[in-house]
């Protein structure tokens, strides 16, 4: 199989099709574009348990970068579903080449991100294995939401407006600036690289999600994985509609464009943590609320 995220056809054929998902307590069964499980805790209860799992396994040396990406790539799915996070379950798979100090620093960095987000590490599992070359961080974010506040990707409908918050490719730009600094220094100034590297502290869309939901939206999708192109495709697939997008209107920073050109990367395929795709019947109202 090809390295990286599996294709939609493989996901449908060899993963989703194999799952038994019939349960009266499950509001949304596993599907393309739906990144959260939503569970009814009791019959007739309005509060729902919301969970989302993400795995971060990029070869990233900076503990702060790894922690931010691992935690927020999961949390952002919770925010996008209209839920408030409570905590995370953390699983670490550590290569035999690492020492205990690296493990300690990794956990400390993850806990610091959780504290910043107002959540805690609820539990998890840690294991050392020869099967991996880099630390693999798996985060399951757990949150809660009222049923009427849920904003699944599948709720988008024809004729609605599409709003994109944050900046396309911001997370990927930050990772490249932190991890490829020596290469970037052959063209860009230290100030330019430092500014791009600092974007790693701006990949949470919690405030934007809350503002949008308050204004009344139908669907929200986190753009972290697969870049904005992948996220738009997932949302269209989940809702069974087409999306008419003006590429020139997608919010993207100039340094993202320049760094992408330097590495010959499509900026619209970069990790886009901090960016949300919002579908609403009244997009103007949502934008006004976001601009407050």
Predicted regions and their residues:
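Helix-biased detector of long, well-ordered alpha-helical tracts
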Residues: 1-292
């Amino acid at each position: 199989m090809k390295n990286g995220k599996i294709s939609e056809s493989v996901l449908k054929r060899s993963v989703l099709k194999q799952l038994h998902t019939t349960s009266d307590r499950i509001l949304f069964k596993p599907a393309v574009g739906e990144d959260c499980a939503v569970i009814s805790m009791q019959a007739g209860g309005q509060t729902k348990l919301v969970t989302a799992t993400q795995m971060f396994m990029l070869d990233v040396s900076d503990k702060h970068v790894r922690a931010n990406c691992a935690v927020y790539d999961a949390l952002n799915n919770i925010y996008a579903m209209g839920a408030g996070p409570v905590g995370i379950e953390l699983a670490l798979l550590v290569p035999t080449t690492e020492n205990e100090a690296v493990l300690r620093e990794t956990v400390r960095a993850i806990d610091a991100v959780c504290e910043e987000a107002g959540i805690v590490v609820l539990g998890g599992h840690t294991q050392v294995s020869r099967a991996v070359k880099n630390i693999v961080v798996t985060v399951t974010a757990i949150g809660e939401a009222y049923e009427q506040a849920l904003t699944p990707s599948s709720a988008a409908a024809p004729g609605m407006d599409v709003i994109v918050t944050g900046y396309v490719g911001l997370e990927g730009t930050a990772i490249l600036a932190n991890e490829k600094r020596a290469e970037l220094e052959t063209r860009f100034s230290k100030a330019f690289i430092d500014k791009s590297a600092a974007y790693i502290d701006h990949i949470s869309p919690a405030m934007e999600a809350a503002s949008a939901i308050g204004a009344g939206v139908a669907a929200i999708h986190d753009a972290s994985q697969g870049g904005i192109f992948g996220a738009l495709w997932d949302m269209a697939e989940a809702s069974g509609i087409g999306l008419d997008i003006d590429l020139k209107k997608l919010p993207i920073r100039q340094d993202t464009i320049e760094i992408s050109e330097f590495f010959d990367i499509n900026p619209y395929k970069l990790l886009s943590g901090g960016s949300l795709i919002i579908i609403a019947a009244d997009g103007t109202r949502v934008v006004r609320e976001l601009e407050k």
